[in-house]
Amino acid sequence: MLVPKRVKFRRVHRGHMRGEAKGGKTVTFGDFGLQATTSSWITNRQIEAARIAMTRYMKRGGKVWIKIFPHKSYTSKGVGVRMGNGKGAPEGWVEPVKRGKVMFEVAGVPEATAREALRLAQHKLPVRTKIIAREAE
């Protein structure tokens, strides 16, 4: 599971996700990538589920790059707790993904295998995505 080793602050503001990603919009390491077309928070569990779906389909052949890391904590108050009395306890970790961001990359497998592996990963994520190929230099 992806979790930061150390953070300066345990609780962070929710923030806004306006516009599209500033960087990481192209396939840089692999041959094919999974690009977000909508914005959302992606949890460390969702990232791990997508990774497992891809690697199992590829039968541990090829290589998978995870280009996002859940560095932001989210909190929740306990069940039956009244409003007020401060912010809740940290519950888990998320990565705010804006549209245009390439989240996963795949290389070392045939195109049909790569596309199917990325399609399986699409179903594990809360954002709409599209499969893109690396541009020829």
Curated annotation (Swiss-Prot):
InterPro entries for this protein: Ribosomal_uL16, Ribosomal_uL16_bact-type, Ribosomal_uL16_CS, Ribosomal_uL16_dom, Ribosomal_uL16_sf
Give the record's GO CC terms: cytosolic large ribosomal subunit
Q: Name one GO molecular function term.
A: tRNA binding
- Keyword entries, A-Z: Ribonucleoprotein, Ribosomal protein, RNA-binding, rRNA-binding, tRNA-binding
The reply on keyword Transport is no
Q: Which PANTHER family match?
A: 50S/60S RIBOSOMAL PROTEIN L16, LARGE RIBOSOMAL SUBUNIT PROTEIN UL16M
Give the quaternary structure.
Answer: Part of the 50S ribosomal subunit.
Provide the protein name: Large ribosomal subunit protein uL16
Q: Lineage of the source organism?
A: Bacteria, Bacillati, Bacillota, Bacilli, Lactobacillales
